[in-house]
C-alpha cells in the first residue's frame, strides 16, 4: 500500500510538473499493480527495462540516418567544424556518464538515490523547462564525484 501511495504522489507531482514521461511510466506501474501483474512483470522490467528503453531511444535517434536524411558528407563534416567536434566530445562525456550511472544504479545497487533523481527531474521539468531524461547522467555524475572524492580522500 505504501508503494502505491508513493507512486500516486509521484504521478501527481509529475502531472503538475508537466513531466509526461514520468507520469506515463507511473501510470503504467500503477495499472500493473491494480491488475496484480506486478509480481510477474516488475522483475522482468527491473532486469530488462533499461536495455529495452535504450534500444527504443537509440532506434529513434538513428531514424534520420535510416531515412537518408544524414549523408556521409554530413558525418564527415562533424570532424571539420568546431561545433561538430564539441558535440562529439560532449556526447562522449555524457554517454560515459550514463554508463557510470547505469552501473551505479543497477550493478552497484544504489537505488536509494532514485527518489532524489525523480524529484529533481520533476522539479526541473516544472520550473526550469527541463525534460526528465537525465537520471542516468545524474547518477553518473554522482558516481564520478564519489570516485573523485574517494581518490582525494585516500
From Swiss-Prot:
The chain crosses the membrane at residues 5-25, 48-68, 82-102, 113-133. It is found in: Cell membrane. Disulfide bonds: none annotated. It comes from the Bacteria. GO terms for cellular component: plasma membrane. The keyword Transmembrane applies. Keywords: Cell membrane, Membrane, Transmembrane, Transmembrane helix. It is a multi-pass membrane protein. Its main location: membrane. HAMAP family: UPF0756. Belongs to the UPF0756 family. This is UPF0756 membrane protein CKR_1028. It comes from Clostridium kluyveri (strain NBRC 12016).
Amino acid at each position: 500500500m505504501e508503494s502505491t501511495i508513493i507512486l500516486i504522489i509521484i504521478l501527481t507531482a509529475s502531472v503538475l510538473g508537466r513531466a509526461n514521461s514520468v507520469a506515463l511510466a507511473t501510470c503504467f506501474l500503477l495499472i500493473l499493480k491494480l491488475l496484480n501483474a506486478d509480481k510477474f512483470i516488475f522483475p522482468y522490467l527491473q532486469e530488462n527495462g533499461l536495455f529495452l528503453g535504450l534500444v527504443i531511444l537509440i532506434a529513434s535517434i538513428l531514424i534520420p540516418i535510416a531515412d537518408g536524411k544524414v549523408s556521409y558528407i554530413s558525418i564527415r563534416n562533424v570532424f571539420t567544424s568546431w561545433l561538430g567536434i564539441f558535440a562529439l566530445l560532449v556526447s562522449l562525456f555524457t554517454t560515459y556518464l550514463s554508463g557510470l550511472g547505469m552501473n551505479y544504479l543497477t550493478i552497484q545497487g544504489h537505488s536509494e538515490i532514485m527518489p532524489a533523481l525523480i524529484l529533481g527531474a520533476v522539479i526541473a521539468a516544472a520550473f526550469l523547462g527541463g525534460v526528465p531524461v537525465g537520471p542516468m547522467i545524474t547518477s553518473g555524475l554522482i558516481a564520478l564525484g564519489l570516485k573523485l572524492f574517494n581518490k582525494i580522500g585516500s
